[in-house]
A protein has these predicted regions:
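Short, compositionally biased
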Residues: 2-85, 102-103, 130-132, 228-238
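A generic structural micro-feature
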Residues: 223-225
Length: 238
């Protein structure tokens, strides 16, 4: 039994027993089929979230309260830091949308007819290769220690890499199942709750590669928002 199977054996066994996934692309945004779900291939971007705001008129909590948070010897509010300008300055519209709390992430997904994944769904997509004929070096049915494969190489962590902050969608190395940034770049909200908190997955650019592993458990207040937290959506295969 592998290290990851000891952490979530029911997920690993179910996936390994019934691999039948292939790639399926949606018009907007790009999606990949992993098992019974279509996954956003990347984290939701500023441009994608902007379409939701334009359609719904949503004003986020960070915008109402004067800006999001960054950790510098403690949580510091940064005036003007919102999903529009994650670091308070104009950015490319293909960087992850951050400074969004759990409800805002879920609302965006629901607007698209999708939802946030569960932690178990997220782990199976991030660590178990389910493509029928994956490109090298990935191997079908292999359980990996990192979403990038055998090593964290190619992810956007605090270790040396080309990206000092969040990387644009698709800029890092594609990982297990062809998904981008399931490890690092920004934390991702999932549905799992612990009281008033919700779980986040995968680590971020602020942390080292150890936060990318499956055994990391990180909960945050559902109302919290910061420069390190984004999300992606899933929906059933039609």
């Amino acid at each position: 039994m592998t290290h990851l199977q000891t952490l979530w054996p029911s997920v690993a066994l179910a996936v390994l027993a019934g691999l039948g996934a292939g790639a399926a692309w949606a018009q907007e945004p790009p999606a990949l089929r992993v098992g019974a779900l279509l996954w956003d291939r990347t984290e939701v971007t500023v441009a994608q979230f902007a379409r939701f705001v334009q359609a719904t008129g949503r004003v986020t909590q960070a915008e109402r309260e004067g800006g999001g948070f960054e950790y510098v010897g403690g949580w510091q509010r940064r005036p003007g830091w919102t999903w529009r300008q994650p670091d308070g300055q104009p950015v490319r519209d293909d960087v992850p949308a951050v400074h969004l709390n759990f409800a805002e992430a879920q609302a965006y997904c629901q607007w698209r007819g999708a939802r946030l994944p569960t932690a178990a769904e997220w782990q199976s997509a991030a660590y178990v290769e389910q493509r029928s004929d994956p490109p090298a070096p990935f191997q079908r049915a292999r359980l990996y220690p990192y979403p990038t494969g055998e090593t964290p190489q190619g992810a956007n962590t605090s270790d040396p890499d080309p990206w000092p902050r969040a990387a644009p969608a698709g800029a890092t190395a594609a990982g297990v199942n062809g998904l981008f940034d399931m490890g690092a770049n920004v934390w991702e909200w999932v549905q799992d709750a612990q009281g008033e908190e919700r779980r986040t997955m995968g680590g971020s650019w602020w942390y080292g590669a150890h936060q990318m592993r499956a055994d990391v458990v990180a909960y945050k207040p559902a109302s919290f928002y910061a420069v390190y937290i984004g999300f992606r959506c899933v929906r059933p295969v039609p």
